[in-house]
């Protein structure tokens, strides 16, 4: 009996394979989105993720066979999707987040095994793409150097900030010590100024009183001078009048002399 050629796949089988390929690609993109949501990203990485998430499904899925779903994704997109898994372990050097990335890759492998029951070719393509992206993320020296340079720059900035803060604290402490040392002297000088102000006010009052007394004494001296001049005129008039008796003239002269001496004594006091 002649060997018949294999039967062409039915429309239902082709539709099932296409649906399996689309489901595998959707799960891969969902895994990348979950990995990006689990870490804090910068504004540029978020924009890149949005641009990557906006890729249509028709560009990701090549054919119905399910063997080339990720051939349209370039190396940068794959490395950006899996950079959160491997890059921190390389840059930190301590492997703090490496086990977490491996666990996620293992979880993804488990999911791929579950999908392999329906689409083995799609699961194999996903595993190959994940391994290639992880290898590219590890072997990219420029990205590692950029991450290390950014972290070193941030570390230097933190060190400079701490040094500046410590210098400011030392300056504040020094100024506070100077203020504490100068405060008693300032208080003493303020007290001395208050005492000098009170003394100056007393001196001003005394100067005003002495000026008033001087005015009174000047007026009294002027009055005495006028009285002396009047007595001298009287004495000369009595000397001129010699027609009177000698006793009267002598008595008048003596009286005038006594009055003159009394006025001069009062003026001297």
Swiss-Prot record:
Superkingdom as given in the UniProt entry: Eukaryota
Boundaries of every bZIP domain copy: 140-196
GO CC aspect terms: nucleus
Keyword line: DNA-binding, Nucleus, Transcription, Transcription regulation
One Pfam family here: bZIP_1
Localisation: Nucleus
Region feature Basic motif, mapped onto this chain: 142-161
Induction info: By white light.
Keyword DNA damage annotated: no
Tissue: Expressed in roots and shoots.
Protein name from the UniProt record: Basic leucine zipper 19
Organism taxonomic ancestry: Eukaryota, Viridiplantae, Streptophyta, Embryophyta, Tracheophyta
Gene: BZIP19
